[in-house]
């Protein structure tokens, strides 16, 4: 049993808190209490994973997290999601948070984007267009939606995303299906 405990300890990665405290009054008033709690918890950690069941407002939670971080720290935010979910982010942002979010395809789009929060799909970051990908290091805060795509340790997406996002100060992932990577 002792060997197994040591094995588990070797696999643990302890994350330091790199975030900041958020006053509840700073949050969008119409959010559900569980969303407000999740946003405050995530921002206080600075780099957190959100495992929330379908229908628990992960989309709005991620948007609010990025809004709060950018309000305090400046810069731009990027949400990376499957292509089929992009429209959901655009509509939920306006419907629930009264904010405009822009879909970006290239770094050129990013550089001229008028909104603070942008959304793109995984392939735009992983593969890019004509070999030029969107650079996560440009952003102050990022969130990876449907992060279950990262669960396969040997996949191209997993292997490429870890180093790409290493320099982003505020990193978040959200999924309804937590699963170990290694």
Task: Give the predicted meaning of each segment.
Residues 54-55, 168-182:
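Conserved helicase ATPase motor motifs in RecA-like P-loop NTPase domains
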Residues 1-169:
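SF2 helicase/translocase NTPase motor core
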């Amino acid at each position: 049993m002792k060997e197994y405990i040591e094995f588990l300890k070797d696999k643990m990665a302890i994350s330091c808190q790199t975030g900041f405290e958020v006053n509840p009054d700073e949050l969008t008033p119409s959010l559900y209490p569980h969303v407000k709690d999740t946003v405050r918890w995530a921002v206080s950690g600075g780099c957190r994973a959100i495992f929330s069941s379908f229908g628990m407002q992960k989309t709005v939670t991620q948007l609010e997290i990025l809004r709060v971080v950018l309000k305090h720290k400046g810069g731009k935010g990027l949400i990376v999601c499957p292509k089929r979910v992009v429209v959901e982010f655009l509509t939920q942002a306006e419907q629930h948070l009264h904010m405009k979010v822009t879909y970006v395809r290239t770094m050129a789009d990013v550089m001229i984007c008028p909104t603070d929060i942008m959304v793109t799909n995984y392939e735009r970051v992983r593969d890019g267009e004509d070999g030029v990908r969107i650079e996560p290091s440009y952003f102050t805060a990022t969130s990876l939606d449907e992060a279950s795509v990262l669960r396969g340790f040997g996949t191209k997406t997993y292997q490429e995303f870890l180093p790409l996002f290493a320099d982003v100060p505020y990193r978040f992932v959200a999924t309804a299906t937590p699963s170990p990577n290694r």
